[in-house]
Amino acid sequence: MSFSDNLAKIVDKYENLGKKLSSGIMGDEFVKASKEYAELEEVVEKIKEYNKAKSELEEANNFKLEVGLDNATLEMIEDEIHTLENSLPKLERAVKIALLPKDEADSKSAIIEVRAGSGGEEAALFAAILFNMYQRYAELKGWHFEILAIVDTGIGGYKEASASIKGKDVFSKLKCESGVHRVQRIPETESHGRIHTSAATVAVLPEVEDVDIKLEDKDLRIDTYRSSGAGGQHVNTTNSAVRITHIPTGITVALQDEKSQHKNKAKALKILRARIYEEERRKKEQKRANNRRGQVGSGDRSERIRTYNFPQGRVSDHRINLTLYKIDEVVKNGQLDEFVDALIADDEAKKLAEI
């Protein structure tokens, strides 16, 4: 089947679904048809744009062959042909991108977890910088940023921190942030001006609802204990801290931020669902991709993905060899779009090359 035939088949399916929805179907059949119709809507819109440009190019070429056209008209037609010939490859690429298999998690909100890695207190300070950077980015995008938990060091650093980021397509934008982030800078306590290197790990998980991941009570072990502060001292006289273990997978989440055990449990369950869902999603993706390497957003947390060099004022993403000399704009103001957009474009190009 040719590319054009395949596109015509998709448009036919979309139009038939529209007729089906207008015919008065109900229940599960309506829900299924509505979902399919919505999934095809964007694709069909791009197909129609592509077909329109193709049709206009054919008409312009035919018109050019007509006898008796004056020079001004010929020049106008040739300009139109040139414009359409330039736009067609872009429109075709847009159609192919729309036809790529979708990650079902892309439209979801996200949970982001930042943990200090190697580098002691410097790593904890860097983890706090990264966490604040993502908060700024969320604000720029108009997303809702809710802190779930912070384990601080007492002097400005974070051992670990997590947040829920709600909005449209949040996960599709942030999933490429998963991995090891490295920082090179001169600590304030460094008297000889030596550059220290430390790291923090970022994990981005799709936020899921109860309907996506059902947790059975029999599969959960819930432990409660007294919460402690940065120095290890107990800061609460009641067992408000919660540790939940999902027995089948061994995944564990511990929360002690809230004074209420109930609130800590609710937050811990939210993170637990996200981690279980992400584990299942990753296994499916691995199987579907047939061990494809180098995938942007694969979530490989052992992969060093980006370096923040403060003395040089640069941020370098090692996956796409992109370096920006605007560290303050990126880190302090959360201006991540240049990296995010470039990573998404690179991922799309790799997937298109496999078609």
From Swiss-Prot:
Swiss-Prot/TrEMBL keywords: Cytoplasm, Methylation, Protein biosynthesis
N5-methylglutamine sites (modified residues): 233
Localization per record: Cytoplasm
PROSITE patterns according to UniProt: RF_PROK_I
PANTHER family for this protein: LD18447P
UniProt similarity note: Belongs to the prokaryotic/mitochondrial release factor family.
HAMAP family (alphabetical): Rel_fac_1 (MF_00093)
Protein name according to UniProt: Peptide chain release factor 1
Organism: Rickettsia canadensis (strain McKiel)
